[in-house]
Structure formats: structure tokens, C-alpha cells
Amino acid sequence: MRITGGVHRSRELRAPKGQKTRPTADRVREGLFSMLASRRPLDGARVLDLFAGTGALGLEALSRGASHGVFVESDRAALLALRENVRALGFEAASVVIAQRAERVVEALKGPFDVVLCDPPYALVREPELAALLSKVAAHCHAEATIVLEHDAKDPPPSILGAIVTFTRRYGDTGLTFYEVSALLKPPAND
């Protein structure tokens, strides 16, 4: 697994052994960031990487010009790899790693975010809790922010209060759904 673009292009990333963490494939990440770049520049963006795992998505965003990344992950082995990857790429000053379950920290997130990258366990996409979680996340985003959800291509993406689906792309068994946060639909943040 490697960074596919930006200042750290081709740099290898650490990943925990085993099947518990499912890093986003390089070609899927390349496609995701190509589509993201066609919609909005990443330069200076504040990025939230939910269910961060190794941090591959958020670190890719930082490599491509984002100014700040918040990584939320609860698995101990993934956190070790994530922290090592942040350190190896020199992104300590631009990164905040939160060792907690996403559901527990969403209310306390310090936004606003321009881009949210969400790669939850695929089974969670079918649960109403994910839609509720992403609706809360939308409240911590700028209007017109982009939320990207990675999911099993067979599963329909959930509806998110405060955001509209703009499109879904399929990469083999992987689906990427892009949402745009709408100022008209956005729920208020709990400050």
C-alpha cells in the first residue's frame, strides 16, 4: 500500500497484519482523489478521516495539499500503523489522531471540515447508525463540503441529513458515494 499522488507519491504505508483492517486499494484511492480534484481543490482543505484505519485516505489528502487532517480510529493495531504513517510522512503538525470510536467523538469534533473521508466496516453501511453518524458529521462541515463514503458496491448508500448524493462510482466490489453538504439541508452543529 502506498501514497498515489502529491508530495509523497509512491511512499509506502504501514498496515497491520491480518484481515481486521481493510485498507482502500491504491487504484480506488487514485480514482477517489481524481474525482475529488475535479470537484474541489484540496489545497488548504481541512479533512476528516473517519474509521481511518492506517490513515491512507487522510494521508493521501495531506500529500495532495490538504492543510489539516483529523483521523478517528479505535482499533489498537490500526492506530499503531496510523501513528507510524503520520510520523514517517512528517505530518505530525498537520494531523490530529483521535483514538476513539467515531460514534463517541462526533459531537466534539472541531470543524468545520471541507472533506470527510469515511471508510467504515462494510456491514455498518447497512445500519441506520451510520446514516445518523454522518448526519451529525455534516453539521461540522462547511456548506458545499464533500463527504465520500466507501462501501460494498452491492449496498445502496445511506441518506444523510444535510447532504445530497451527487454520484456513486464502482470499482469492482467497492462503491464510492460522493455527497455534497447543503447549507439549506444542514442540521445545526451542537456548539
Give the residues covered by each predicted segment.
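Class I S-adenosyl-L-methionine-dependent methyltransferase catalytic core
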Residues: 1-191
